[in-house]
């Protein structure tokens, strides 16, 4: 699995990472969602460099221009609900893509433990397709592995690009060891070393879904 960390380069990408982490700025849910969307757009631009292209003649008002056009139409997949702003950022650039939505949530048990449950999925056929699977946080890595397994029930993709803004070291290792599909690339914005007993990344940013859409009960 190839790993690409966009946060290792100095760019405005890191400015948006800072804002979604900042405990004061992230209180503005509209700004939080928009920053996640912007981050998704930057990820989409970088991922587009990995797609297939061919030269085509384009007619302009004054002549013919040879342009390099993307010949792939990736399927964009997201884990609800936290992944929606990130998904929208990807969709802003891959605006002809088909879409896939996966419902994954923590089912809490007594004592504070929980298990990840997937109860809903809407997807086109993924046979031979390039898939971009996004979730803003990669903590334990369990939900991402389960989401990938769910995707594979809809066909065998050509390649899966996994997009996670903030990851834990433990989550990356778990994904490496347990991924059900080897032909994949992990794109991330930051890697944090610690994680709480409840699988929240430290320093992380908190609960991305709650910050974007409000607290749940």
PLM region spans:
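PRPP-associated nucleotide enzymes
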Residues: 1-217
């Amino acid at each position: 699995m190839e790993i690409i960390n966009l946060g290792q380069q100095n760019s405005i990408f890191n400015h948006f990472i800072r804002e979604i982490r900042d405990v004061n700025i992230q209180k503005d849910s509209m700004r939080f969602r928009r920053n996640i969307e912007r981050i998704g757009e930057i990820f989409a631009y970088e991922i587009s460099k990995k797609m297939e292209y061919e030269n085509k003649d384009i007619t302009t008002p004054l002549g013919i221009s040879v342009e390099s056009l993307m010949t792939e139409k990736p399927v964009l997949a997201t884990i609800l609900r936290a992944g929606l702003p990130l998904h929208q950022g990807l969709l802003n650039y891959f605006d002809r893509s088909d879409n896939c939505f996966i419902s994954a949530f923590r089912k809490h048990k007594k004592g504070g433990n929980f298990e990840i449950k997937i109860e809903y999925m809407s997807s086109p056929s993924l046979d031979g397709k390039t898939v971009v699977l996004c979730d803003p946080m990669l903590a334990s890595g369990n939900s991402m592995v389960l989401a990938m397994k769910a995707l594979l029930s809809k066909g065998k993709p050509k390649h899966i690009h996994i997009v996670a803004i903030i990851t834990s070291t433990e989550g990356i290792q778990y994904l490496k060891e347990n991924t059900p599909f080897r032909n994949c690339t992990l794109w991330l914005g930051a890697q944090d070393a610690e994680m709480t007993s409840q699988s929240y990344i430290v320093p992380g940013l908190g609960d991305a879904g709650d910050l974007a859409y409000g607290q749940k009960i």
